[in-house]
Amino acid sequence: MAIVNNHPEETREALLKTDPKISSKEVVIDDRYAAVASEASIQATKASLEAKSHEVTILETKEEAFEFLKNLIPKGSSINNGHSTTLEEIGFISYLKTATEWDNVHAQILAETDFAKQSELRRLKGFTVDYYLSSASAITEDGIIVGCDGTGTRIGAWYATGGKVIIVAGTNKIVKNEQEASERIYKYTLELESARMRLAYKLPGSAVVNYALIKGGNPYSPK
């Protein structure tokens, strides 16, 4: 199937051209953190994650990632997701808008226009789904998944979701260690997210309010 990204204007390539702060060089993006990881780095990271009770699947293309994710989640499951450019770029967010095989809790949350009720719905249903779909800000070669957000909707779900968390990430997220993960976040991810916030919400930028390190999976959780 054709990959459909409903927000092509929010991709890295688009933001580098259209964001006034980035295009004018007022803000400098560290492009080292956009590079695809080497095969050796990918395999080392996979081995480290698996040693820490995570299940890992490596896929070569966006199409493969889309099909794998679609087939991974059992029909009838409740699902939720946070914002993820990766999920957008593989076409999964677009697919969710019309998919009927799952209980899409994220759509139910966004359909609530009252902010207080939406927050309550997010707390009561958003964190109790069977599957929560997300991405990571960085993944270290020694198997640490690093995430951050500004409001707690992503990080909160990582910790509180009653079911399983699925992290979909490109190999450009792989870094050597925690220090490089922090550098990637503050020198790359935050600046691109700030550009997206300026475009999508007319805000001055984003902020790292919550910063999480997942150092291992739950060793007592059933597969």
PLM features: residue spans?
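Conserved phosphate- and dinucleotide-binding cores of soluble alpha/beta proteins
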Residues: 126-223
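Flexible, glycine/proline-enriched loop segments at strand-loop-helix junctions
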Residues: 32-33, 108-111, 165-172
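N-terminal active-site beta-alpha-beta segment that forms phosphate/nucleotide-binding
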Residues: 38-123, 128-132
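Short low-complexity stretches enriched in small and charged residues
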Residues: 10-13, 31-39, 119-126, 182-184, ...
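A cross-kingdom feature marking charged/low-complexity
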Residues: 2, 23-30, 87, 104
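Catalytic cofactor-binding cores of redox enzymes
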Residues: 21-27, 73, 89, 161-162
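Generic N-terminal amphipathic, Lys/Arg-enriched alpha-helix
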Residues: 11-55
